[in-house]
Amino acid sequence: MKKKLAIIGAGIAGLTLANLLKKNSNHEFMVYEREESLSLEEGYGIQLATNSIKILNQISFDKINNEKIFHPKTIEFYNIQNEKICDLNLSKFNSNEAKYTTLQRSTLIEFLKEDIYTQHLRFGKKMKEVSELKDKVLIKFDDNTNDLVDFVIAADGIFSNTRSFFEKKKNEPRFKKAIAARVILKSKSEFDINEENISLMLGSNSHIVLYPINKKKELNMVC
């Protein structure tokens, strides 16, 4: 039986599910995003393990522009003095169809929105009320629109507004007094590392991660 789904959140999880539904089912669905647009500016890098690549390949991720991604073969571990400790061979987990991949988040979002943007994505939709109505869920948004659906999928992140409408016990993220700073290095770094690999530098209360995000060898650095 055909069902109607509301996906709340147009991030990686929400857009991936939307693409899978469009390709593999006849269910009706809509992605609702509270922001007014998708952020497609050059942003931070992300790493995709082979399990996630297998899922993305079901929606033709293997056809993405190869210049915009990278396949590091090794994770190298260093101490904070840049002395190598050990390494992990990532290529052992690869197959011909699915390889460990690094790229910018915006590159992945650009790919995921391609088949969804026009018909299945609505912006400026912040949920304000949820109620049950004859085995269905009535969603009301703060722009005075609504939708009646069979299922609601919360994909709006760790600060999820959606989750608060369904959880009996309220849970909130806890600040662990740790922060992450991210930057893209577009020129050769001053670190003594192999810039085709993932480098993890370990300190007593901190660490630095560097890895290439495209064939131009631009590096994502997190510290």
Regions found by a protein language model. Give the residues of each.
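Conserved Rossmann-like nucleotide-cofactor binding loop
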Residues: 13, 37, 159
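Glycine-rich FAD pyrophosphate-binding loop
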Residues: 20-42
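Conserved N-terminal helical subregion
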Residues: 2-5, 22, 49-184
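Nucleotide donor/acceptor-binding cores
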Residues: 3, 27, 137, 195-196
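Short helix-loop capping/hinge motifs at secondary-structure junctions, enriched
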Residues: 54, 187-194, 216
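Beta1/beta-strand and adjacent pyrophosphate-binding region of the FAD-binding site
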Residues: 1-13
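Active-site substrate-recognition segment that forms the wall
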Residues: 196-223
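Residues at the starts of beta-strands that form the adenosine-phosphate
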Residues: 4, 27-30, 218-221
